[in-house]
Amino acid sequence: TVTLGTLDGANVEICEEAGRENNYIFGATVDEVGAIKQYYCPSEIIEQNPRLKRALMTLVDGTFRDDSGMLRKLFESMTTGYEPDRYLVLYDFADYIRVKTQLLYDFGSEEFNKKCLVNLASVGKFSADRSVTDYAKLIWKT
């Protein structure tokens, strides 16, 4: 198992344990986000990336049934309103495609298998048993 994700949340801890080089990290870092948001315009990203535009339009062009309106709300949350694409999903899209392509290229190779083994050997910190034990010690003082 490897992680394909942005370098935030639990992925930071996973990379600390297993090494960033053993995972597939894409997108803006937490340190970059503030500067990006000062000039960020999602509509420019959409217009510059036809593949992204096609994917985004499937949310509202009838490709998928949307009786609840959830897909339209998702589309609007990334393209309009007070703070469109708040989580920089559109901004990170091109880098996601690049890194995912690399992952698919690497898949099954000896190097990829090594990354998986390193990750598997490093996940003890994230086990439910450890979490429950730590919680019991912290909360119940056992």
Language model segments and positions:
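Catalytic binding pocket for nucleotide-activated donors in carbohydrate/polymer assembly enzymes
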Residues: 1-116, 121-125, 130, 134-142
